């Protein structure tokens, strides 16, 4: 189970940063790609992740399980689809009503990215709780998991900026990210059904 949770944490970090980079491409047609757009995206992601860390920590207190962990990934996958289906009308609606692109991009970022990012932010604290069995090991467990998650974020950043954006349309990449989340959720759910002795 330890290896599986590390793989899940890696995938979570990968998807978060890939989605953040795609945010710039999503907002660009309406709000440009200036520093204020990236400032809006980064602000929304940081605030959303902080809420996700808080909620993930709270959720992990009572009866943490691999099934619930899998459900976080599945919900994150589902919440990527509104980006594919509704990003254009949401941005057009905001663009026509907020003249200042700074606040327009901030509002659009909030509407589009808060929910999936909050959910994905729950992964890190929940994964720590699943692996901590002794209080004295908690620091080492957390450090290793955050290393793996951040490594996933770094690779997700490079793969998205160097390759995915060049090879695929934004919606195609979002669909692939959603599929990855669903696949790892399925693997986690199957693992949760195995007898504890075999994990």
Give the location of each predicted region.
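Alpha-helical transmembrane segments of multi-pass membrane proteins
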Residues: 1-199
């Amino acid at each position: 189970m330890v290896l599986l949770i590390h793989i899940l944490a890696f995938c979570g970090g990968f998807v978060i940063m890939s989605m953040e980079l795609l945010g710039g491409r999503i907002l660009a047609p309406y709000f440009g790609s200036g520093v204020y757009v990236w400032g809006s995206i980064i602000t929304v992601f940081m605030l959303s992740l902080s809420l996700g860390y808080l909620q993930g920590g709270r959720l992990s207190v009572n009866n943490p399980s691999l099934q619930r962990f899998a459900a976080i990934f599945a919900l994150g996958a589902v919440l990527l689809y509104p980006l594919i289906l509704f990003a254009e009308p949401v941005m057009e609606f905001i663009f026509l009503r907020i003249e200042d692109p700074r606040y327009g991009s901030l509002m659009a970022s909030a509407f589009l990215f808060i929910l999936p990012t909050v959910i994905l932010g729950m992964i890190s604290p929940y994964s720590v709780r699943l692996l901590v069995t002794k209080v004295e090991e908690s620091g080492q467990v957390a450090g290793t998991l955050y290393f793996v998650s951040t490594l996933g974020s770094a690779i997700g950043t490079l793969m998205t900026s160097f390759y995915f954006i060049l090879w695929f349309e934004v919606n195609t990449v979002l669909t692939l990210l959603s599929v990855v989340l669903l696949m790892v959720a399925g693997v986690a759910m199957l693992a949760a059904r195995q007898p504890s002795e075999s994990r």
